[in-house]
Amino acid sequence: MLVNKYHFPFDTIREQQSQIIDELNKIPPEKKYIFLQCGTGIGKSALAVTMGKTAGKAYIVSTSKQLQDQYVKDFSNKGLVTMKGRSNYPCFVLDDKSDCSKGPCIGLPEIKNSCKEHCSYYKQKELANKSQLFCTNYAFLLSSGDLKKRDLLVFDEAHNIENEIISFATINIKPLRTLKKVKKTVTKDDFIFCTRISIDSTKDEIADFVSVFSDKYILPHIESLKGDIALLNIEEKSSKIISALDHITKELKLFESLYNKITMFNSRPEDYCFETLYDGDDFVIKLTPLNPSRILKTYTDRLANKVLFMSATILDFEIFAESLGISTDESAFLSFESTFNPELSPIYNLSCVDLSYKNLDNKDEIDSLIKTIDFIVKQFPNDKGIIHTGNKTITDILYDHFFDDERFLFRITTIENQVIYNDHITSDKPTILVSSSMLEGVDLSDDLSRFQIVCKLPYLSLGDKRIKMKTEMNNKWYELQMWQRLIQSCGRSTRSENDFSKTFILDRLFNRAFFNAKKRGILPQQFEKRIISR
C-alpha cells in the first residue's frame, strides 16, 4: 500500500512515524487487510489521516464520540468531517429542545425531502459524504445502510471491533412483553403462539418461531407506528404533539432495529448462539452471533477497497485475524513499540490474592484484598488513583469496607462511571476511582492518577454462553481478550512521555498468565519491561 508522507497532517513527522510509513509502503498491493499495532505515544491518528488522504477518500471509525471530537480538534483543517448519531443534532421541524432522533422524518421519508436543506443532521451527513475523511463511530457505521464505498476503511481502537459487532447484532426478545406492546387486544391464539417456546426448545424450533414472530407481529407494528406519525399534526408543534412524537419515534427505532437484526439472523441462524432464559412470568430468547466475521465482511466489502485495523493491543495477529474471519494470506501485520519509558510506569506483580469466582466469599482472600488495598492507598496519601476491580461483586465488597472513606468514588448500581469520573477530575481531594468498567476510554493523565490497582485479571465471564463456546473452541482467544483488556487498563494513568504512575497487580493468576503469554510472544516489549515481580 502506497502512503505519501506529503499528506502527513503536521509540520514535523517523528522518526518512528516515518519508519512506519516506509514499512507500510513495502506491503504488497494485493493485501486488502492491514493490521497495524502502534504502542501508546506513536501518534497513530496522524498515520490514519496520512493513509486516508493518500488513498483518496476514507472512513475513519472510532469507538466513542470523545475520540471523534479529538480527531476533529486535530484534523478538521485537513479535510476531516465528523458524523454522529441523530441525537447529536437539533430538529428544527420541532422545537429548539428536540433532537433529530425524535424527528418525524424517521417514520415519514417524504418529510425528509421537504426539510433536507435545513436539517442539521442531513446537512452534516452531506458534508461528511463530500469530505475526503469521513470520521464516525462504530454505532453509526453499523446502523447506516446508505454509506457509499470509499478507498480506505480505518478501524481505530480495532481491538474493540468484535465486541462492537456482537453487541450491535445480538437479539433479545421477550415474546409476551413484546406481544402486549404491539397488540391492543391479545387473543388466545396470540398467547398460545407466544408461549410455545420454552427453555427446552430446539434451535430449529426457536429459529422458526423468531422468523414467524417477526413477520406476524413486529413488521405490522412498524407500519402501524409509521401510520401514527402520519396522523400527527406536526406543524402544531405543541408539547402534546412533540411528546407523542418522541414516544412513537423511540418505539419505531427500537422495533426497526429488532426487525433488521432478525432479518440478519434469518439469513444464517447456524452462525448464532441460542439461549432461552426465564424472566419472571416471561422468558427471553437471546440470539448472539458466535463470530463477527460474516457481518464484518458485509461492511468491508461494501464500504472499502482496503481496510486498516489500528490498535495498541492487537497482540496476537493470527488469533485476532481468525476471530474476524480474515485470512492471513490476504493480510499484512506491522507492530511498533510504545515510545514511553517503561521505568516511569512500573507494574508491581504482588500476586497476593485469588479472586476467582469460588473465592469471592472466602474470608481469608477478602481480608488479604482489603489489607493490601488499604496499605497501597496509604502510600499515596496525597495522590489520586484508580482501582480496577475486575467485576461488580468485587466493587461491592470494596464498597462495604471503604464506603465511609471520602477518598473512594464507587461505580455502583445507582452511580455511573461518568459521574464519578467528573467528581474525580473536579475534586481537589486525592480521590480514588473504583470501577470494573474503566479499562479504557478514560484519560487519567498527570495528577489525575499516580497509582492504579488491578484486583483481578479482567477475564471475560464464562457464565456467558457465547464466551464459553468460543473459549472451548480456542482458549488462546480467551487469553487474548484478557491481555487486551489488562494492557489497556494498565495504560490509564500514564498518558504522555513525561507522565508517570505505579500499577499494582494483586491477582495470583498473573504469574501463570504472564509466563504463557511470554512463551507465545504476544506481549509488547515495553509492557514486559514494566513488570516488576517481587
Q: PLM ranges: what are they?
A:
Residues S351-D364, T413-A513:
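Conserved RecA-like P-loop NTPase helicase motor core
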Residues C115, Y121-Q132, L142-L152, K297-D301:
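Short basic/glycine-enriched coil/helix segment immediately N-terminal to the Walker B
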Residues K84-Y89, Y138-F140, T389-T393, L409-N422, ...:
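Conserved helicase motor
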Residues S131, Y138-A139, E157-I161, I165, ...:
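Conserved Walker B
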Residues K44:
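Conserved lysine of the Walker
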Residues L2-P9, E15-N25, P29-G39, N77-I111, ...:
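Conserved coupling segment at the C-terminus of the helicase ATP-binding
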Residues L47-T50, T54-V93, K392:
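Conserved Walker A/P-loop ATP-binding site and its immediately adjacent core
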